[in-house]
Amino acid sequence: MTSQFASLWQQSLEILKQELKPASFDTWLKNTQLVTIQNGEAHIGVPNDLARDWLENRYATLVKNALSVVLGESVEVRFFTPSADSRRSEPSRRPVATEESSPPLLNPKYTFDTFVVGNSNRFAHAAALAVAEAPAKAYNPLFVYGGVGLGKTHLMQAIGHFVIEQHPQSRVVYVSSEKFTNELINAIRDDKTVEFRNRYRNIDVLLIDDIQFLAGKERTQEEFFHTFNALHESSKQIIISSDRPPKEIPTLEDRLRSRFEWGLITDINPPDLETRIAILRKKAILENLDVPNEVMVFIANIIQSNIRELEGALNRVIAYANLSGKSLTSEVAEEALKNIIPSHRAKVITIALIQEIVAEHYNMRVEDFKAKKRTRDVAFPRQIAMYLSREMLDVSLPKIGEEFGGRDHTTVIHAHEKITKDIEKDPQLEMTIQVLKEKIQRA
């Protein structure tokens, strides 16, 4: 390692020290080195295969971000064991990991403290917290499903962190169904199925991610069925995640499906605008980023699919601003995201857009919202438009009032309170509000 690479790596390690617990840093990163950087890829030497696999699976993004900050440009990372590279072509017979040989693969950032709760995930969060506080006594199993990047893994691992923090002697295992399958295949090949079963049946909490990948794998389903039974009969907690509910997983054995339904099934939906903004704010706070509110609102309006893409967009905007030497503004954010924003992308939601959609729905003119008319056929839609402006936008009450003919902020408060109460009493109005929100988001 040249002195230049040594210096770059030392600076990167200083950043990583702030991100990780001392024990994690000392175990996985202390004895690593930056060997070279070629074609935008940093080659990082690690002491053994276990460290390489651990870093690749759990800390690659953290290391990449730290090194990119030091270099001032984006870089990919590759971990390798120098002594192993020369024998890479030889077949490897790795032992099946045991609970003593490796701790649970939990991302240090995935805790309840960093999980942003909103309408889309409130029930799932409450269920996860209940399970964490009383393993095997609240809901067992807990089955969490939802689309990609919505926080299922975060919530699962938060349970693991909480249990370990409250009960340090607890044996917690987190594994993806793909890794479970691969370990089973290796165990059968190496005649180590006893060790494999000990690994997964002599534990207190099992967190298994993406269970839908067991579909069609009869031997793996058979093994997991017996693992599930062994744990459940011993009053051990099982938490499962999937991209769909049990009944919709194809070629899943009925006996497994029925067991997944023994406990509680809860879903996580895409976050609404308010939650997306809150997620970006939380990320900015946790990473000490100075991001103007207008930029976060812009990104939250553009990226509506999932949290992973939302946070990725913020990273892209910040990197673009830093590398181009520009200040963070919504205009710069639009420049940074121009390649990932569809040409037919939705308009940025504004008060004017909300007024336009509501006016069209009630067959009236936008100008009527700003007029002094107080008849119900005008006042009620106006109140709905004010309500939606308050719910869907992060703007001040005076600003909303100003856009509705210079009305006082107390008028906006009254409108919001009235519509909120009306929704509670009128299911039809609740449905109308939801339809209007969807129209606005698709506009």
Curated annotation (Swiss-Prot):
<dbReference type="GO" id="GO:0016887">
    <property type="term" value="F:ATP hydrolysis activity"/>
</dbReference>
<feature type="compositionally biased region" description="Basic and acidic residues">
    <location>
        <begin position="85"/>
        <end position="97"/>
    </location>
</feature>
<dbReference type="GO" id="GO:0005524">
    <property type="term" value="F:ATP binding"/>
</dbReference>
<comment type="function">
    <text>Plays an essential role in the initiation and regulation of chromosomal replication. ATP-DnaA binds to the origin of replication (oriC) to initiate formation of the DNA replication initiation complex once per cell cycle. Binds the DnaA box (a 9 base pair repeat at the origin) and separates the double-stranded (ds)DNA. Forms a right-handed helical filament on oriC DNA; dsDNA binds to the exterior of the filament while single-stranded (ss)DNA is stabiized in the filament's interior.</text>
</comment>
<feature type="region of interest" description="Domain II">
    <location>
        <begin position="80"/>
        <end position="104"/>
    </location>
</feature>
<dbReference type="InterPro" id="IPR013317">
    <property type="entry name" value="DnaA_dom"/>
</dbReference>
<dbReference type="GO" id="GO:0006270">
    <property type="term" value="P:DNA replication initiation"/>
</dbReference>
<comment type="similarity">
    <text>Belongs to the DnaA family.</text>
</comment>
<dbReference type="Pfam" id="PF11638">
    <property type="entry name" value="DnaA_N"/>
</dbReference>
<dbReference type="InterPro" id="IPR018312">
    <property type="entry name" value="Chromosome_initiator_DnaA_CS"/>
</dbReference>
<dbReference type="InterPro" id="IPR003593">
    <property type="entry name" value="AAA+_ATPase"/>
</dbReference>
<dbReference type="InterPro" id="IPR013159">
    <property type="entry name" value="DnaA_C"/>
</dbReference>
<keyword id="KW-0238">DNA-binding</keyword>
<feature type="region of interest" description="Domain III, AAA+ region">
    <location>
        <begin position="105"/>
        <end position="321"/>
    </location>
</feature>
<feature type="binding site">
    <location>
        <position position="151"/>
    </location>
    <ligand>
        <name>ATP</name>
    </ligand>
</feature>
<dbReference type="InterPro" id="IPR024633">
    <property type="entry name" value="DnaA_N_dom"/>
</dbReference>
<keyword id="KW-0235">DNA replication</keyword>
<keyword id="KW-0547">Nucleotide-binding</keyword>
<dbReference type="InterPro" id="IPR027417">
    <property type="entry name" value="P-loop_NTPase"/>
</dbReference>
<dbReference type="GO" id="GO:0005886">
    <property type="term" value="C:plasma membrane"/>
</dbReference>
<protein>
    <recommendedName>
        <fullName>Chromosomal replication initiator protein DnaA</fullName>
    </recommendedName>
</protein>
<feature type="region of interest" description="Domain IV, binds dsDNA">
    <location>
        <begin position="322"/>
        <end position="443"/>
    </location>
</feature>
<dbReference type="Pfam" id="PF08299">
    <property type="entry name" value="Bac_DnaA_C"/>
</dbReference>
<dbReference type="InterPro" id="IPR010921">
    <property type="entry name" value="Trp_repressor/repl_initiator"/>
</dbReference>
<dbReference type="GO" id="GO:0006275">
    <property type="term" value="P:regulation of DNA replication"/>
</dbReference>
<feature type="binding site">
    <location>
        <position position="152"/>
    </location>
    <ligand>
        <name>ATP</name>
    </ligand>
</feature>
<dbReference type="InterPro" id="IPR001957">
    <property type="entry name" value="Chromosome_initiator_DnaA"/>
</dbReference>
<feature type="region of interest" description="Disordered">
    <location>
        <begin position="83"/>
        <end position="105"/>
    </location>
</feature>
<dbReference type="InterPro" id="IPR038454">
    <property type="entry name" value="DnaA_N_sf"/>
</dbReference>
<keyword id="KW-0963">Cytoplasm</keyword>
<comment type="subunit">
    <text>Oligomerizes as a right-handed, spiral filament on DNA at oriC.</text>
</comment>
<dbReference type="GO" id="GO:0003688">
    <property type="term" value="F:DNA replication origin binding"/>
</dbReference>
<keyword id="KW-0446">Lipid-binding</keyword>
<dbReference type="Pfam" id="PF00308">
    <property type="entry name" value="Bac_DnaA"/>
</dbReference>
<dbReference type="InterPro" id="IPR020591">
    <property type="entry name" value="Chromosome_initiator_DnaA-like"/>
</dbReference>
<dbReference type="GO" id="GO:0005737">
    <property type="term" value="C:cytoplasm"/>
</dbReference>
<dbReference type="GO" id="GO:0008289">
    <property type="term" value="F:lipid binding"/>
</dbReference>
<feature type="binding site">
    <location>
        <position position="153"/>
    </location>
    <ligand>
        <name>ATP</name>
    </ligand>
</feature>
<feature type="binding site">
    <location>
        <position position="149"/>
    </location>
    <ligand>
        <name>ATP</name>
    </ligand>
</feature>
<feature type="region of interest" description="Domain I, interacts with DnaA modulators">
    <location>
        <begin position="1"/>
        <end position="80"/>
    </location>
</feature>
<keyword id="KW-0067">ATP-binding</keyword>
